[in-house]
């Protein structure tokens, strides 16, 4: 697979979108791969493979249109409960895609990050992740965050334990604990919170994703299944986003 895309009708930012009001950070819950495959009498793994192509195009689209960061919810802590052959396929797919796409990501200026408990992943995948993060660390065109073995509740517990350890060691006064400090101990420490959270397939839940980070994100749900979420669908999501008034709890 190559990140180089075919000529596209929506390469430039559509004229009806205000560049100054684009979300800085878009996060996506990529749902519907299995249903997409089932509708076509294909194995579920074909839906996941098509979903990779969709994600690559969305990453390129965000870069083309001037969005600073894209986060993809790739694998949750709960996804280990799926059938073993599917889990094994996904781990292999992640590794293959990283290995094949790294050169293009470097050339395209993509800075890749992984958030989640990576220690549970296969050692070979961990090695590819480390290599990709190191190789793209100085890139500045777009941040690409991949949530892998990620769970929002587990992340918060991890942050609490990290802070508690510093307090116990006498390195931190409990009175100094605030939102800024807490955020530094999250997997996403140093990354901006999402402005827009997109969920495909029509499900009305956030599935234990970014429980802290989406506190003030605008949420957009589409019935489009993830493999069918193209630039036109993303355009519609951004149009909807720009019609909203973000109040952040104020009047």
From Swiss-Prot:
UniProt remark on cofactor binding: Binds 2 magnesium ions per subunit.
Pfam families: Prenyltransf
Domain of life: Bacteria
Keyword Transferase: yes
GO BP annotation list: polyprenol biosynthetic process
Record-listed substrate binding positions: 32-36, 44, 48, 76-78, 80, 82, 199, 205-207
EC number annotated for this UniProt entry: 2.5.1.-
Cofactor(s), names only, from the UniProt record: Mg(2+)
Active site, per annotation: 31, 79 (proton acceptor)
Binding positions for Mg(2+) per the UniProt entry: 31, 218
Entry keyword Transferase: yes
CDD domains registered for this protein in UniProt: Cis_IPPS (cd00475)
Family label: Belongs to the UPP synthase family.
Assembly and oligomerization: Homodimer.
Biological role stated in the UniProt entry: Catalyzes the condensation of isopentenyl diphosphate (IPP) with allylic pyrophosphates generating different type of terpenoids.
Name the UniProt record assigns to this protein: Isoprenyl transferase
């Amino acid at each position: 697979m190559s990140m180089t895309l075919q000529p596209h009708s929506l390469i430039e930012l559509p004229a009806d979108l205000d560049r100054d009001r684009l979300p800085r950070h878009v996060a996506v819950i990529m749902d519907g791969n299995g249903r997409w495959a089932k509708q076509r009498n294909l194995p579920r793994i074909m839906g996941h493979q098509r979903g990779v192509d969709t994600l690559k195009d969305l990453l390129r689209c965000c870069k083309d249109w001037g969005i600073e960061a894209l986060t993809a919810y790739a694998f949750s802590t709960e996804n280990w409960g799926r059938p073993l052959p599917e889990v094994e396929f996904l781990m292999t797919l992640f590794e293959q895609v990283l290995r094949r796409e790294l050169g293009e990501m470097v050339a395209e200026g993509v800075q890749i990050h992984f958030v989640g408990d990576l220690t549970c992943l296969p050692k070979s995948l961990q090695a590819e992740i480390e290599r990709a993060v190191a190789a793209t660390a100085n890139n500045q065109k777009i941040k690409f965050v991949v949530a892998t073995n990620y769970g929002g509740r587990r992340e918060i517990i991890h942050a609490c334990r990290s802070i508690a350890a510093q307090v116990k060691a006498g390195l931190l006064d409990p009175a100094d604990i605030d939102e800024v400090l807490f955020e530094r101990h999250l997997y996403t420490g140093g990354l901006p919170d999402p402005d827009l959270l997109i969920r495909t397939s029509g499900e009305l839940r956030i599935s234990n994703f970014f429980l802290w980070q989406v506190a003030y994100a605008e949420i957009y749900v589409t019935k489009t299944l993830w493999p069918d979420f193209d630039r036109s669908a993303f355009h519609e999501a951004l149009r909807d986003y720009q019609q909203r008034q973000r109040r952040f709890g104020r009047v």
